[in-house]
C-alpha cells in the first residue's frame, strides 16, 4: 500500500512538473517568435525540449525523473529570484534570463553529480578499541548502496574491487542494496565474481530493502543473486552472528523492512562481549538498540 501511495505521488509530481516546464519553455522569446499568434504551435514548440529530456527514459527512467525534478525545482527558484529582482528594480527583463539560468544551473549541477557518482573516492575512518582483535590493525572495507547499474556496471565495479584488493583488506562487509530493480543479470554476475578477492577473513553480505526487488521486471531472481554470491565465497548473514577466526563477531541483521527481524537482544544471546562486535544493519534506524546491546561498530547504508 505504501509503495502505491509513493508511486501515485511521484506520478502526480511528474505530471505537474511536465506541465510547469511546458509553461516555462513557452516563455522563451524564440518560441513566441516562431509560433507567432498560433497558440497550438507555441505549445508544440515548448514540448520539444520536454521530449528531448524524455529520451533519457530509454536509458533509465530514474535518470529521466532526476532530470525532470531538478529542472523544475531550479526553474521555480530562478523564477522566484527574477520576481524579487523585478520588484526591487521595478523593471521588466527584456529576455527570459530566469529560464536560461535554470537550464544552465541544472546542466552544471547534474554534470557535477554525474562526475562524482562515477568517480569513487576512498574515505577512511580510524577507530580504536581496547579489545583484543588478534592484530595491531584491522582493515575493514564497507561497500554500501551500490545499486548496481545506476552508477557502476559490472565491469566498473570489478575495477573498484581491484583497487580494494590492492589495499589488502582484512574483511569486506556489504550492508545492503548491492542491486535493485534496475540491475541487469550480466552486471550482477560480473559484480559477484569481482567480490571473490583475497582477504584475511572474507567477504560478508546482508540484504537491504532493494536487493530482493520490489517488482518482477529485472532479469534475475533473488535466489539467483544469492547463488552467485555464495558461488564466489561471499558469506550471507540473515539475522545471524558468526565468530570470525575466534577473534571478533560479525552480526548481519535482516533489513528493517522485513516482517520478521530478530532483536539485538536475541542476536547477542551467547556472545562473548569481551570480543569485538561488528553489526551490519542496512538502514541506520536502530543505533540506540545496537549501542545498548554492546556492539562496538555498526555499519549501515
Predicted features along the sequence, with ranges:
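Non-catalytic terminal accessory segments
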Residues: 1-118
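Phenylalanine-focused residue identity feature
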Residues: 7, 20, 25-30, 58, ...
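Extended recognition/assembly regions associated with phosphoester-bond processing machinery
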Residues: 18, 63-79, 125-129, 267-280, ...
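Arginine residue identity/basic-tract feature
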Residues: 24-27, 32, 40, 75, ...
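Generic structural signal for short, solvent-exposed loop/turn connectors between secondary structure elements
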Residues: 53-64, 91-93, 131-135, 244-247, ...
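N-terminal signal-anchor transmembrane helix
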Residues: 86-144, 149-167, 184
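Soluble catalytic domains of enzymes that build or remodel membrane lipids, polysaccharides, and related
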Residues: 135-301
Amino acid at each position: 500500500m505504501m509503495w502505491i501511495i509513493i508511486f501515485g505521488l511521484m506520478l502526480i509530481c511528474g505530471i505537474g512538473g511536465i506541465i510547469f516546464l511546458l509553461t516555462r519553455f513557452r516563455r522563451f522569446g524564440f518560441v513566441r517568435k516562431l509560433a507567432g499568434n498560433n497558440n497550438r504551435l507555441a505549445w508544440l514548440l515548448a514540448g520539444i525540449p520536454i521530449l528531448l529530456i524524455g529520451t533519457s527514459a530509454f536509458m533509465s527512467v530514474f535518470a529521466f525523473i532526476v532530470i525532470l525534478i531538478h529542472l523544475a525545482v531550479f526553474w521555480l527558484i530562478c523564477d522566484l529570484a527574477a520576481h524579487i529582482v523585478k520588484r526591487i528594480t521595478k523593471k521588466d527583463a527584456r529576455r527570459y534570463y530566469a529560464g536560461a539560468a535554470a537550464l544552465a544551473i541544472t546542466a552544471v549541477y547534474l554534470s557535477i553529480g554525474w562526475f562524482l557518482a562515477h568517480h569513487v573516492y576512498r574515505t577512511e575512518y580510524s577507530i580504536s578499541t581496547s579489545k583484543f582483535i588478534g592484530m595491531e590493525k584491522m582493515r575493514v572495507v564497507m561497500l554500501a548502496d551500490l545499486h548496481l547499474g545506476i552508477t557502476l556496471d559490472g565491469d566498473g565495479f570489478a575495477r573498484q574491487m581491484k583497487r580494494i584488493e590492492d589495499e589488502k583488506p582484512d574483511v569486506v562487509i556489504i550492508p545492503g542494496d548491492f542491486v535493485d530493480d534496475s540491475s541487469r543479470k550480466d552486471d550482477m554476475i560480473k559484480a559477484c565474481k569481482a567480490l571473490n578477492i583475497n582477504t584475511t577473513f572474507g567477504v560478508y553480505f546482508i540484504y537491504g530493502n532493494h536487493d530482493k526487488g520490489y517488482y518482477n521486471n529485472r532479469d534475475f531472481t533473488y535466489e539467483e543473486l544469492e547463488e552467485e554470491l555464495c558461488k564466489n565465497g561471499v558469506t550471507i548473514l540473515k539475522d545471524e552472528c558468526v565468530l570470525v577466526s575466534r577473534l571478533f563477531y560479525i552480526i548481519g541483521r535482516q533489513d528493517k523492512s522485513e516482517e520478521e527481524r530478530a532483536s539485538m537482544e536475541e542476536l547477542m544471546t551467547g556472545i562473548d562481549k569481551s570480543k569485538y562486535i561488528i553489526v551490519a544493519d542496512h538502514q541506520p534506524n536502530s543505533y540506540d538498540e545496537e549501542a545498548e546491546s554492546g556492539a562496538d561498530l555498526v555499519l549501515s547504508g
